[in-house]
């Protein structure tokens, strides 16, 4: 809700991102840690995309969505970390008004797309395990492209609408955001005008981007587990579980981190806790994803090996 009691209303040209620490001596350490994780995220996800695109054996629905998930993870991390690194390097906390809205839009869009792709990948595993005879028709290239397009539309439109609604909000002279990125809830706390519509939009996006994909994932894995336990052969069970083990690991890490923070009692809320949660699902998990999908997957390891061999041959 807006704060009608505030009368010091002004046209805001920029905001201040307070970052993760107020201590100057900690800034070089934070810069090194986040630069390292960002580079690992970008290189790891780029290698997955190159390995999948260069190996014809990986031109399947599962790896098609994995390549798009890797691209989404790279874009999601790039929406916030480079600006944080630039602010630390220049010893500045400023982000322009337009830059803040642009960052918010990309974070919402790619964050929502990440969730949507995780749900689609769970459905892909459900069809592969529970309906193997219909897999080629149920997950045809045309349908995969359609599902990807639907995910882009479903995440882009609400993110754009929320960002446009923020342009109608009047902000007060106070413009400090206690995060390393433009958090929508923190932005609304700086508003001087009514924000009921914006808050309703945040709730709607939470349901659309988090709750609906999670329900689809849970439904898919309930059906998968039921189908796997019917299999009498231990080898068959292991093969079925191995096809979705990496995806399930990523899902548990991502949603587990969110629930571990946001389902705690409101009395324990703090900006520090929310910042740590943001670091976990915006930086650490995208950094781990390439390792999870490559180290636990024989086909990916073989494709990466071929990619490195071809790279050495090219440079030699």
From Swiss-Prot:
Keywords attached to this entry: Disulfide bond, G-protein coupled receptor, Glycoprotein, Membrane, Olfaction, Receptor, Sensory transduction, Transducer, Transmembrane, Transmembrane helix
Disulfide bonds: 100-182
GO molecular function, one term: G protein-coupled receptor activity
Cytoplasmic topological segments: 50-60, 122-145, 221-243, 296-316
Glycosylation sites: 8
Assigned GO CC terms: plasma membrane
InterPro entries per the UniProt record, alphabetical: GPCR_Rhodpsn, GPCR_Rhodpsn_7TM, Olfact_rcpt
Record's bilayer topology term: Multi-pass membrane protein
TM segment ranges: 29-49, 61-81, 101-121, 146-166, 200-220, 244-264, 275-295
Chain ranges on the Extracellular side, renumbered to this chain: 1-28, 82-100, 167-199, 265-274
Superkingdom assignment: Eukaryota
Compartments (UniProt record): Membrane
UniProt GO BP: signal transduction
Family listed: Belongs to the G-protein coupled receptor 1 family.
Main function: Odorant receptor.
Protein name listed in UniProt: Olfactory receptor 1N2
Protein source organism: Homo sapiens
């Amino acid at each position: 809700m807006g704060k009608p009691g505030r009368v010091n209303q002004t046209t805001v040209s920029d905001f201040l991102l307070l970052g993760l620490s107020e201590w100057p001596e900690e800034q070089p350490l934070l810069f090194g840690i986040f630069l390292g994780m960002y580079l690992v995220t970008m290189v790891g996800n780029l290698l997955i995309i190159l390995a999948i695109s260069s190996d014809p054996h990986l031109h399947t629905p599962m790896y098609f969505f994995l390549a798009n998930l890797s691209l989404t993870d790279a874009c999601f991390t790039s929406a916030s970390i480079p600006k944080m690194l630039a602010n630390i390097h220049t010893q500045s906390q400023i982000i322009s008004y337009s830059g803040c809205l642009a960052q918010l839009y990309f974070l919402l869009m790619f964050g929502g797309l990440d969730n949507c792709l995780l749900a689609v990948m769970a459905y892909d595993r459900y069809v592969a395990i529970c309906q193997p005879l219909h897999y080629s028709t149920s997950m045809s290239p045309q349908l995969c492209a359609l599902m990807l397009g639907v995910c882009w539309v479903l995440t882009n439109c609400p993110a754009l609408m929320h960002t446009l609604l923020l342009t109608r909000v009047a902000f007060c002279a106070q413009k400090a955001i206690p995060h390393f990125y433009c958090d929508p809830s923190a932005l609304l706390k700086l508003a001087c005008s009514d924000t009921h519509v914006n808050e309703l939009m945040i709730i709607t996006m939470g349901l659309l981007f988090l709750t609906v994909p999670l329900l689809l994932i849970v439904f898919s894995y309930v059906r998968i587990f039921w189908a796997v336990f019917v299999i009498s052969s231990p080898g068959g069970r292991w093969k079925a579980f191995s096809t979705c083990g990496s995806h399930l690991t990523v899902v548990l890490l991502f949603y587990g981190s969110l629930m571990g923070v946001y389902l705690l009692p409101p009395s324990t809320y703090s900006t520090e806790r929310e910042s740590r949660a943001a670091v976990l699902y915006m930086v650490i998990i995208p950094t781990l994803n390439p390792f999870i999908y490559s180290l636990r997957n024989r086909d990916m390891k073989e494709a990466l090996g071929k990619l490195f061999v071809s790279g050495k041959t090219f440079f030699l």
